[in-house]
């Protein structure tokens, strides 16, 4: 048994060794796995913590980072990676305050940077950006490179900046393939920006300086649905004829606060739903302006100069729900009888506001829908008259209504029915026909550069079209100038004319209050301005006005010089008198006598409270208290005993019961104290 034991030991030792090795290997592999898992978990947690870290000056909420109204001069550098919307408005951030690592935030889609200190379009923006607000900054330029860095941009707000037409780089929007909304309100634009993206659906250019719109201004904008041009300098003559007709998908057009005399020609009719024309100078509307606008729901013509509307203007407006006509001088005559009937018939579906009569006098202040008996007089029967004649005149007027010239800036043609370009060799008689009987004009040259025009209309009119042309130089092509004159005016003064020149002046009635003018032939007259050196010039009139006007210029200058010299002499005399008086005063001060200064001091002390002022070698006493002293003071010196001191007490003048006491308790016998 002793021999077998070692054998057993030798046999079992290799097995134990193998088992221990396997156990150690397994333990080692498990430890490595655990270490790897722990490292990965730590890295993941670190990434999560970094992505959710919020800047200390901001507030974060599920991807929305609120850093607005903090007075920041730069964007915080530790913006979380999961941020989707950055609110950075109402700060003082400039272009240098936009960090470069902002473009690495690939989840950011909306940035609000309005009301900051940006003077250039920011470039360090994430490519994922879809909406950018830059209102109320000082951005001056729009470069193609800046927009190319954010190709996914859909909405760009640049209101209230300093962008001008020349500061927009050519093809600046060439890489903005997804831009749908562009706001450029309240900038310095003088024309429509070129190269706008074809994907644009909403364009706002209100409150700029746009005065002209050429034919190609909106070329290719087939997706445009909303166009706002309020508060510009637009007039009919500076808008090309087919400017808006190409915008077939337009649903809203706003031309508020411009200088339109009539609605623009060829408005888009297929899908237009809202048309805003208020706050212009519109005095007439052609009968076919709103033709085929079957989708129109809202029409605003408030704050214009309309007195009447042509029959059938609203015939195609089957979906019209709101019609605003406030603040117009409506003349509720027979020509508006059709409108009264239309308002009553559509009262259930159309909300009409502001159709208040301003004339005739008997219906002033009444709503047109409430007028019955006055308009029923238009139906008086008679042979070939009554309703038939009134209807015939009204119908004829619809087709003969004047159209404000539009597009003449680009076509260089004057569209004036019945008015040819004047020729200096042709005489211009007064117009004939029914239209000529309603208007008579008289012209008179006042000065070398002005002509006065007066006229008389037999029927009240909403407006007159006045045109004039200088003759004698180029009969075939003349520079015709025209303007619209309100119907209540009876005279007009032409100024800034050429001296000794012949002018042909024509006037036509746009619309009368009771019936339209069937014949639009203008009434014309000639006038010749005076010679610039003739007796009718303003200068000669002023010279002949009175005797003072004939004084030579040298006499006027001499009189002015004499007047100035007189003032100088008087000033010298006043100065001399002043100096002499001061010397006399000083002499008297020297010769006052030999009284001593102590006398002045003593008398001043005894009589009243005074101050001493030293002037020259003597003393002068100036009283400052006009009241008499209430009691005289006698000064006594009190010698206190050894070891005692004087106590101080307040003394009031006029109260004799107040006494002072020494430390020994013995009262003083005097009423004054030291």
Swiss-Prot record:
Expressed in kidney and brain. The gene is FLRT1. The chain crosses the membrane at residues 553-573. It comes from Homo sapiens (Human). Residues 437-532 form the Fibronectin type-III domain. This is Leucine-rich repeat transmembrane protein FLRT1. SUPFAM superfamilies: Fibronectin type III, L domain-like. One of its GO terms (molecular function) is fibroblast growth factor receptor binding. GO terms for cellular component: cell-cell junction; cytoplasmic vesicle; cytoplasmic vesicle membrane; endoplasmic reticulum membrane; extracellular matrix; extracellular space; focal adhesion; neuron projection terminus. Coiled coil: none annotated. Residues 574-674 are cytoplasmic. Pfam families: LRR_8, LRRNT. It comes from the Eukaryota. Plays a role in fibroblast growth factor-mediated signaling cascades that lead to the activation of MAP kinases. Promotes neurite outgrowth via FGFR1-mediated activation of downstream MAP kinases. Promotes an increase both in neurite number and in neurite length. May play a role in cell-cell adhesion and cell guidance via its interaction with ADGRL1/LPHN1 and ADGRL3. It is a single-pass membrane protein. Glycans are attached at residues 249, 305. N-glycosylated. Keywords: Cell adhesion, Cell junction, Cell membrane, Cell projection, Cytoplasm, Cytoplasmic vesicle, Developmental protein, Disulfide bond, Endoplasmic reticulum, Glycoprotein, Leucine-rich repeat, Membrane, Phosphoprotein, Repeat, Secreted, Signal, Transmembrane, Transmembrane helix. Disulfide bonds join 54-60, 58-67, 332-357. Residues 1-48 form the signal peptide. InterPro entries: Cys-rich_flank_reg_C, FN3_dom, FN3_sf, Ig-like_fold, Leu-rich_rpt, Leu-rich_rpt_typical-subtyp, LRR_dom_sf, LRRNT. GO terms for biological process: cell adhesion; dendrite development; fibroblast growth factor receptor signaling pathway; neuron projection extension; positive regulation of synapse assembly. Residues 328-380 form the LRRCT domain. LRR repeats lie at residues 82-103, 107-127, 128-149, 152-173, 178-199, 200-220, 223-246, 249-269, 271-292, 295-316.
